[in-house]
């Protein structure tokens, strides 16, 4: 059976991705300013232009990070979520999910921001794809991606709600919040492709939690207004 076989998978791809991101950051950290700027513009994702990497920039941008905080925050979540997802779905599916989430998040961002000449870098879009898979396929799997041990469905919903709020209020933080949501969407599609029944159950669980939170918020607001 699929579950028995995939359960034996070790997080080798997760570890390889983390290692590659760290190595690329070391190149940026110790490179000259001119070299680093050239690297970011040639291998980062620029919606209005294609750099020296050509279409390959849809992959290379995922392995570049702006600073240590950017790197550590992404890799912390990748380690916490990635190893669990990889063990569950298998290394091959995991790798394809990761790349597909990052690539299509980049493509949609390019399509919706065609005039932007700002390079986009970072693994967040791909990582949000993995977050979606954990939310749908492993809703009750406890993860420390947000430092506190939380079920995957709670962790995923919190992050998605934060990103939705950031997009709605147009937060100007130098962060491509829209790409996080695009990556999450691709991850959801991937989860349904891997195991429709499990993903559907995970979706129902997530929707029930959101409904409960909405009812609680309405009730709580009513209590405050009455008081």
Cite the ranges covered by each PLM segment.
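A detector for small-residue-rich transmembrane helices and their helix-helix packing motifs
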Residues: 1-227
């Amino acid at each position: 059976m699929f579950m028995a076989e995939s359960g034996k998978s070790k997080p080798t791809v997760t570890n390889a991705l983390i290692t590659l991101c760290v190595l690329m950051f070391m190149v940026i950290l110790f490179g000259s300013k001119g070299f680093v700027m050239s690297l970011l513009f040639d291998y980062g994702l620029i919606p209005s232009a294609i750099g020296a990497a050509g279409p390959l920039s849809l992959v290379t941008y995922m392995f570049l990070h702006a600073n240590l905080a950017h790197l550590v925050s992404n890799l912390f979540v990748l380690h916490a979520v990635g190893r669990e997802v990889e063990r569950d779905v298998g290394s091959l599916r995991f790798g394809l999910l990761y790349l597909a989430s990052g690539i299509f998040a980049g493509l949609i961002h390019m399509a919706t921001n065609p005039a932007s000449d700002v390079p986009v870098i970072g693994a967040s879009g791909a990582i949000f794809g993995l977050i979606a898979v954990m939310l749908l396929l492993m809703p009750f799997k406890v993860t420390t991606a947000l430092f506190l041990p939380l079920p995957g469905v709670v962790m995923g919903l919190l992050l998605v709600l934060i990103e939705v709020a950031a997009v709605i209020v147009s937060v100007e933080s130098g962060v491509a919040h829209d790409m996080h949501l695009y990556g999450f969407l691709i991850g959801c599609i991937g989860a349904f492709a891997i195991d429709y029944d499990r993903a559907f159950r995970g979706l129902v669980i997530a929707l029930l939690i959101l409904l409960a939170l909405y009812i609680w918020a309405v009730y709580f607001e009513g209590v405050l207004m009455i008081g």
